[in-house]
Every structure is written in structure tokens, then in C-alpha cells.
């Protein structure tokens, strides 16, 4: 499917012109449109084919320095949207107008679309692969192809637009044995291709490891977080590196730029041209950039939007994103990459004497404080370099900052988990508690 870019541009220009004629000093229009085609399988059977479209337009204005924002979904009456934004601006305090200047840039389309028949085949292949070895399991698969288009234009001449197509495949398997219930989930997002057999094989491997239930080792023991579970740790660092948190003084790293904050093996960065969540510009029209946050354990940069950067006395890093169309830009991330190590996942396991593997967790993350206590939804015990079975009723507690200073090993098995590209890692300094069988 192709979007009508001419109609979108005409609407954006009309909104800017009407806003300025109505008394706005400056104005900005952000349009977001998406079209999603999907196939949803439940209990091993096709449940439905999905076809959805959405379109939203956000107008941001300043009058007498006061900002106002109004949003419309679907067809838009330009004057009504302008009047609403200007009325809302009267409720806000004056601020420095922060808009990008620029010229018209249309970025190349990323990705390619596939027909619904291909989505059906991917879903069927994943289910057949899982049930070949475990015929008793119930599989749920959600496979879709999403086309997204973004247009950002303002009264200072900025006009940037981008379109991309992304595939998503999420699979979960329910395995019931008497009163023992287990759900294993996996999936991926990609602009290139989907490998349903590989996803199913990942789940099969975890079912193999869960054949036996065993007692967990307890106390302060090494914990191996798989690439699927490691984002729980990285979420805390993402909050600590947020320029707005630094400005507020709530980040524990506010005064540590240039200092060692994690183990020296850890390097974290963002890359605008890598992965399914890459993007050429942020929601303020600033070009995104390659940015190193932590290099060999040393804090290098915080990420910020235009307003936060100005208040911090630095330039924006191109990380001004809106949580929703009706929100103002705030510091945000589009991708997060952790430099992998050199040891395979099985090599990491082989060097563990007695440890826990965490693959899925229940509950929220640690927050910016770093303190956490989570239930292990899916985990395993390692003894003398071998996985001996699944652990149940187990909790892991500790502090993220402490754990990442006590890094034992980074794996080479980096994978995308949402917008986070991370390998597995082994950390110390955490406490494990569990029920004895």
C-alpha cells in the first residue's frame, strides 16, 4: 500500500498557513500514518486476518510565546484544529520557541511489504516446527507487516518525511503437564526477513531445558540473563542517561560524565541506520546520530531533545520524541545497542559452576534507583556447566548499578528484543531465593 503523500502535504501546509493567519508566531505539524496487515493464530489454528489503518495529525503552535497542541485522527478540519490549539495555548506559560530550521528532505523507504499469504506461511511454519517435537503444546502466533509514514513540517521551512515497512512475529507456546503450566515466548522484528523456524527452534530449546523441575541454588550466586531478559537491566541505565533526569538531578549519574560507571567490558551506543527501529530524524526534525553513551565502562554522553539540551548547555542529540501525538517532545530512544562479547551462549553456561539462568521475568523493572526484586517466570539452574532443569517459585533481587559493576561475562549472542540489541550476560552481586522441592 502507498500513502497519498500529496494530500498529506497539502493538509500540513494548510494548517501552517491558517495557524499563522490566526495569530500564531510559530507552528509545527506532525503527521503519522500506518497500515498493518496481519495473521493471528490461536490454539494452533488461524483465528483471524487483520487489516487496520490509522492516521493522526498533531498541530503545535505558539502565540505570545505560549505553546498549545491539538490532535485529530482521520479526516481533519484545518480551522477547527487551529482554533483548538490556539485556545489550549492560553492555558500554558510562555516559553522559548524551539523549532528546527531546514529544507525539504524525503528519506528513502526502508523495508519492503509482503502479501498476507506470506504472513500465513510464516505462522504455519512456526507452529508446525514446534508441534513436530511437542505435539501437545498450544501455540499462539501473531505475524504482521506494518507500513508507517511520518511527515514533519514547520513554519521555519523544515519539511522532513520518512516511510518504513517492518515485519513482526511473536510466538508463545503453552505446555501443560498435570498441574505444571509453562508458557515460553519469543519473537522478532525485522525490515529484512522473518525466520519462523529459527524462532520456533528457540522455543523448542527452552522446552527441552524445562523437562525437569529442580531446586534453585540460593544466596549470592552468579545469574545469567539471556538476551531476552537482559533489557530489564538496561532499562535502568536508559533512565539514568536521560538528559531530563540529569537536569532534574534525579539521575544518579548526573555528575559522573567522564567517570567509570560500569564494568569496563560494557559499551553502549545508538545507531540511526541499524536495526528495525532505526530512524533518520526525531520528532523535532533533528537528524538522529550515532551516539556512544558508555565506552569501556566510562560515561560519555546523555541523550536529550532541543529544550533539555539548551537547559543543559549543549546541543540536542536528536532524541526528541513524543510518547504520543498529543504530547510534547521529550528525551527518548529509538534504539539501544550493547556491544557483544566473544563467548557463545553455551560457552557462558559451560563456565558456570552453580548458577541461575533468567529467561523470562514477572513484574516491572528496577526503575532509576536500580533496586529490583523480580519473580523468575522462566529460569533454569546450571550445575557444573550443564543446565539441569527448570527452577520455579524463584526470585532474584539486587541493584542494577551494582550488578553491572560486577559483570562476569558478556555473550556473543546479541539479539533484538524490542528496540534493544543486547547479548546475554552473567553478573554477580545478586541474591536468589526460591522454594525447595
Where are these regions (language model features)?
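Active-site bordering "gate/hinge" segments
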Residues: 1-279, 286-289, 295-298, 384-386, ...
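Dual-mode signal for accessory low-complexity, basic/Gly-rich regions
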Residues: 103-104, 253-437
Amino acid at each position: 500500500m502507498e500513502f497519498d503523500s500529496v494530500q498529506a502535504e497539502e493538509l500540513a501546509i494548510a494548517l501552517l498557513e491558517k495557524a499563522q493567519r490566526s495569530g500564531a508566531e510559530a507552528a509545527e505539524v506532525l503527521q503519522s500514518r500506518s497500515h498493518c496487515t496481519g495473521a493471528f493464530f490461536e490454539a494452533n489454528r488461524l483465528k483471524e486476518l487483520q487489516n487496520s489503518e490509522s492516521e493522526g495529525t498533531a498541530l503545535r503552535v505558539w502565540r505570545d510565546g505560549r505553546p498549545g497542541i491539538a490532535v485529530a485522527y482521520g479526516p481533519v478540519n484545518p480551522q477547527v484544529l487551529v482554533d483548538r490549539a490556539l485556545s489550549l495555548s492560553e492555558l500554558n506559560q510562555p516559553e522559548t520557541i524551539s523549532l528546527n530550521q531546514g529544507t525539504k528532505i524525503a528519506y528513502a523507504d526502508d523495508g519492503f511489504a509482503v502479501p498476507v499469504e506470506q504472513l500465513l506461511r510464516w505462522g504455519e511454519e512456526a507452529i508446525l516446527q514446534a508441534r513436530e517435537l511437542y505435539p501437545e503444546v498450544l501455540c499462539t502466533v501473531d505475524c504482521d507487516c506494518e507500513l508507517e509514514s511520518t511527515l514533519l513540517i514547520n513554519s521555519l521551512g523544515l519539511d522532513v518525511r520518512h516511510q518504513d515497512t517492518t515485519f513482526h512475529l511473536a510466538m508463545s507456546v503453552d505446555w501443560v503437564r498435570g498441574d505444571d503450566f509453562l508458557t515460553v515466548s519469543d519473537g522478532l522484528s525485522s525490515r529484512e526477513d522473518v525466520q519462523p523456524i529459527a524462532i520456533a527452534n528457540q522455543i523448542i530449546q527452552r522446552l527441552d531445558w524445562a523437562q525437569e523441575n529442580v531446586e534453585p541454588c540460593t544466596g549470592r550466586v552468579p545469574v545469567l540473563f539471556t538476551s531476552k531478559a537482559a533489557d530489564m537491566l538496561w532499562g535502568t541505565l536508559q533512565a539514568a542517561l536521560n538528559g531530563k533526569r540529569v537536569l532534574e538531578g534525579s539521575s544518579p549519574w548526573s555528575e559522573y560524565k567522564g567517570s567509570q560507571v560500569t564494568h569496563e567490558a560494557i559499551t553502549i551506543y545508538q545507531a540511526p541506520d541499524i536495526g528495525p527501529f532505526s530512524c533518520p530524524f526525531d520528532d523535532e526534525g533533528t537528524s538522529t546520530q550515532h551516539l556512544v553513551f558508555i565506552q569501556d565502562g566510562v560515561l560519555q554522553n546523555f541523550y536529550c531533545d532541543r529544550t533539555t539540551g539548551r537547559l543543559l548547555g549543549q546541543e540536542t542529540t536528536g532524541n526528541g520524541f513524543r510518547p504520543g501525538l498529543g504530547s510534547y517532545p521529550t528525551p527518548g530512544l529509538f534504539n539501544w545497542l550493547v556491544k557483544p562479547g566473544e563467548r557463545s551462549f553455551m560457552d557462558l553456561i559451560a563456565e558456570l559452576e552453580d548458577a541461575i539462568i533468567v529467561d523470562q521475568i514477572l513484574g516491572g523493572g528496577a526503575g532509576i534507583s536500580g533496586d529490583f526484586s523480580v519473580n523468575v517466570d522462566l529460569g533454569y539452574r546450571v550445575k557444573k556447566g550443564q543446565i539441569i532443569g527448570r527452577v520455579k517459585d524463584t526470585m532474584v533481587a539486587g541493584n542494577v548499578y551494582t550488578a553491572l559493576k560486577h559483570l562476569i561475562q558478556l555473550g556473543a549472542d546479541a539479539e533484538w528484543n524490542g528496540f534493544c540489541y543486547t547479548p546475554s550476560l552473567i553478573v554477580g552481586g545478586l541474591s536468589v531465593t526460591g522454594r525447595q522441592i
